[in-house]
Regions:
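Structural beta-strand segments of beta-rich domains
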Residues: 14-18
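Recognizes extended acidic, P/S/T-rich segments that occur
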Residues: 30-66
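C-terminal accessory segments
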Residues: 438-532
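Predominantly extracellular beta-rich ligand-binding scaffolds that present long acidic/polar faces
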Residues: 308, 314, 330-477
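Surface-exposed loop/turn segments connecting beta-strands in extracellular beta-rich domains
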Residues: 130, 138, 154, 158-160, ...
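Extracellular beta-strand/beta-solenoid scaffold signature
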Residues: 135-142, 158-167, 189-205, 226-242, ...
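Extracellular beta-strand-rich solenoid/capping regions of secreted or surface-exposed proteins
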Residues: 62, 104-121, 131-173, 195-207, ...
Length: 537
């Protein structure tokens, strides 16, 4: 039976968010997809049904750019399909503005945009290096007031507030291959009277969206956020989106600083407990290195409707990924690496890997929960020592699904049961004594940011163990023995998320033996080449 669903597919470079409207819901649904010219279908991870919106929705991930896909949903006897083409990584440019090489102390204001048929590119003149250094005498290096604009290869220094300001409602802006440093006011706790919170390398005002922020080096703001010993951190941020229109991709950036010039959030925004927020909907955050944050490395809070966060390396932070709230969902957090977490300069105890939370707001006189969206948390690897103390924060949590994660933590793994709708946690490795042994031996040594699983690991075999050595019986108490790595081939199959596993079952954690490792940071971007600010010295 073919039903006339109202269907919608919203692509990015490597993902498609899909929406199939169905007034009553027809029970659990199945999703499958294929390249439009292919014969073989692939199974996707099942969608969720949201009775509030009367629709099935979910995401397909790991897709190829600039490729047409056919997506089919089946719910009971009902079936519907839609075609969608992922974004091309090549932007058609019909107007180019070359900025004269050298140092400029004037704000660049972009008031002329392009269109869907052709973008307006702003870049240094060929063979030159353009530096905007406004010496803290202007609030911004660049102000974007038009749609379909590309900023490429610029060096932006010493903005008084935000280095790049994207005005309210502006859409379709690409910021790529830029170096941004030294922006913002002095940070610090609000109880000290400091008001310079959220000064950002890239700041998008409400309603802006469809932003691509990629391959940038964002580092060392002028000020620094306070740590938790003086209250909630407040200070500079790398990227901030305020009540975005959605459709954003933030990928392959390196966002870093020092502890004394640390960020509040690396990637963040607002409004948190809302049905909009940052990045709001149909957005991807992947391939980034984010560090030196006193609150959240990645803050994805608000609607989180078909938001995907994957393959990020996160360290020197308090919270790795913040998700309070996830009002609509689904939010997918998968194959990230969670490194060092700390509370303050003095307290290295650690925060939490995933912040949750919700509240109730009044909409048209109705009390509405902001905590009913699904969170899918798959195949992440948490490192120790000095990683997050707890996996989840202690806030009320519903509709969280966790699978195949290495959650090495010294504190609480899962939050208390808050009743219906319930969470679903399974096939994770949790605790501070994983596998009953020496956790470091679980991973193969590497000089790169990768943590593939060793086939075997060391563990303590408790008790008195006798063995034959040289014809004699020798008894050893609590010997260290080699044992099978408990993360190898121990995961659950998750269609669309781990189809390419190479063993008897998927490995637990972010790295699958026999497959390429996730790569992080701007230099890991496919086809990466150095920008003029690196080559024209």
């Amino acid at each position: 039976m073919v039903t006339a669903f109202l269907v919608l597919a919203i692509p990015t470079f490597e993902s498609i968010g899909y929406y199939f409207e169905h007034a009553a819901g027809a029970g659990p649904a199945k999703i499958r997809y294929k390249m439009a010219d292919a014969k073989e279908w692939r199974e996707g991870y099942p969608p969720v049904y949201d009775p509030r919106e009367k629709e099935y929705r979910g995401s397909l991930v790991g897709l190829a750019p600039d490729t047409e896909y056919e997506v089919e949903l089946q719910a009971g006897a009902h079936r519907a399909s839609v075609r969608s083409r992922t974004w091309s990584e090549r932007f058609r440019v019909t107007k180019t503005t070359h900025l004269k090489g050298g140092v400029s102390d004037q704000t660049v204001r972009i008031t002329e945009g392009g269109s869907a048929a052709g973008w307006h590119l702003v870049e240094p003149a060929p063979g030159s290096r353009f530096v905007s250094d406004v010496f803290n005498l202007a609030e911004n290096n660049v102000v974007v007031e038009a749609d379909y604009v590309i900023l490429r290869g610029l060096e932006l220094i010493n903005a008084g507030v935000h280095a790049v300001l994207i005005r309210k409602g502006v859409k379709h802006v690409v910021i790529e291959d830029c170096h941004i440093t030294g922006w913002g006011r002095v940070g610090g706790a609000r109880v000290w009277g400091v008001v310079g919170g959220s000064d950002s390398a890239v700041y998008a005002e409400p309603g802006a969206g469809h932003l691509v922020i990629q391959r940038n080096l964002i580092e060392s703001p002028r000020g620094g956020a306070n740590d938790w010993e003086s209250g909630h951190p407040s200070g500079p941020q790398g990227i901030t989106l305020i009540d975005s229109a959605g459709g954003n991709v933030i990928r392959y950036n390196t966002i870093r600083s020092t502890e004394d010039h640390g960020f509040n959030d690396g990637i963040g925004g607002g409004s948190n407990y809302s049905f909009q927020g940052s990045p709001n909907r149909d957005s991807d955050i992947y391939g980034n290195i984010v560090s030196h944050c006193w609150d959240d490395a990645i803050e994805s809070e608000g609607a989180n409707r078909n938001v995907r966060i994957w393959s990020n390396y996160i360290h020197h932070t308090f919270v790795h990924v913040a998700t309070a709230a996830t009002a609509m969902g689904p939010l997918y957090v998968f194959r990230n690496v969670f490194g060092e977490s700390r509370v303050s300069h003095q307290d290295r105890t650690g925060g939490m890997m995933i912040k949750t939370g919700m509240n109730y707001i009044n909409i048209a006189g109705e009390r509405v929960s902001t905590g009913l969206g699904y969170r899918f948390i798959f195949h992440n690897t948490a490192l120790q020592p000095n990683g997050g103390l707890d996996v989840f924060s202690s806030h009320e949590l519903h509709n969280a699904v966790s699978r195949n994660n290495i959650f090495y933590s010294r504190g609480r793994a899962y939050p208390r049961d808050a009743g219906e709708p319930r969470n679903d946690f399974a096939t994770d490795l949790t605790g501070g004594y994983l596998g009953g042994g020496f956790v470091k031996s679980m991973f193969l040594q590497s000089e790169r940011l990768e943590w593939f699983l060793a086939p075997a690991m060391n563990k303590i075999q408790w008790g008195r163990v006798e063995s034959e050595r040289g014809g004699k019986t020798v008894a050893i108490t609590d010997p260290v023995v080699a044992a099978k790595n408990p993360a190898v081939d121990a995961g659950a199959r998750l269609p669309g998320f781990n189809d390419g596993y190479t063993g008897a079952a998927p490995d637990i954690g972010a790295f699958e033996t026999g497959l390429p490792a996730p790569r992080f940071g701007r230099e890991a971007a496919p086809g990466f080449t150095r920008a003029a600010w690196e080559t024209q010295r």
